[in-house]
Amino acid sequence: MFKKLFGLGSKTNEETIVAPLTGAVKNIEEVPDPVFAGRMMGDGVAIDPTEGVVVSPVDGEIVQLFHTKHAIGIKAKNGTEILIHVGLETVKMEGEGFEAHVSEGQAVKAGDKLISFDLELIREKAKSTITPIVITNTDAAESIKTTVGVAATKGSTEVMKVTMK
């Protein structure tokens, strides 16, 4: 009762996800990959980046950094687990053109630089530069609200609001 009366509790369950990249925000269904478009990895959005920098979309912890540096997992303070997968079929690049600025277990704040990448090299060597940002523990979420069709600025534009159960 007190939680509802004083607005306690609800704030800890809700997480605002800001854009980890600068670019056009798209519906996850627009990703030209059936695994992401079919939400098999989780619900979310995708960004078609205009620059090669990924920043943290939340305050949280780096829980996974792929050795090829093309993807990173972050756990927000409310338990939301976020996967940022730079481009499609970029794993085949074996880390070429990617640089990590964080390591697993590291605490991060929204806007902290996580990965930098060579956008032109990805255009040349991978299927697409489109970058899915998905909530991998979608089943633990009460609601996921997405904002698509906007031009996002990394570290500031809200792209999702996730409320955990």
Swiss-Prot record:
GO BP terms, alphabetized: phosphoenolpyruvate-dependent sugar phosphotransferase system
Keywords for the protein's UniProt record, in alphabetical order: Cytoplasm, Kinase, Metal-binding, Phosphoprotein, Phosphotransferase system, Sugar transport, Transferase, Transport, Zinc
Active site: residue positions: 85
Gene3D superfamilies per the UniProt record, alphabetical: Glucose Permease (Domain IIA)
Major place of residence: cytoplasm
Cofactor note text: Binds 1 zinc ion per glycerol kinase EIIA-Glc dimer. The zinc ion is important for dimerization.
Cofactor: Zn(2+)
Residue stretches making up the PTS EIIA type-1 domain: 33-137
GO molecular function, one term: metal ion binding
A Pfam family it matches: PTS_EIIA_1
Binding-site list for Zn(2+): 70, 85
Site residues by UniProt (Important for phospho-donor activity): 70
An example Gene Ontology CC term for this record: cytoplasm
Record-listed Phosphohistidine modification sites: 85
Top-level division of the source organism's lineage: Bacteria
Subcellular location: Cytoplasm
Free-text note on domains in this protein's UniProt record: The EIIA domain is phosphorylated by phospho-HPr on a histidyl residue. Then, it transfers the phosphoryl group to the EIIB domain.
Subunit and interaction comment: Heterodimer with glycerol kinase (glpk).
Function, as annotated: The phosphoenolpyruvate-dependent sugar phosphotransferase system (sugar PTS), a major carbohydrate active transport system, catalyzes the phosphorylation of incoming sugar substrates concomitantly with their translocation across the cell membrane. The enzyme II complex composed of PtsG and Crr is involved in glucose transport.
UniProt cross-references to PANTHER family, sorted A to Z: PTS SYSTEM GLUCOSE-SPECIFIC EIIA COMPONENT
Protein name: PTS system glucose-specific EIIA component
Organism the protein comes from: Bacillus cereus (strain ATCC 14579 / DSM 31 / CCUG 7414 / JCM 2152 / NBRC 15305 / NCIMB 9373 / NCTC 2599 / NRRL B-3711)
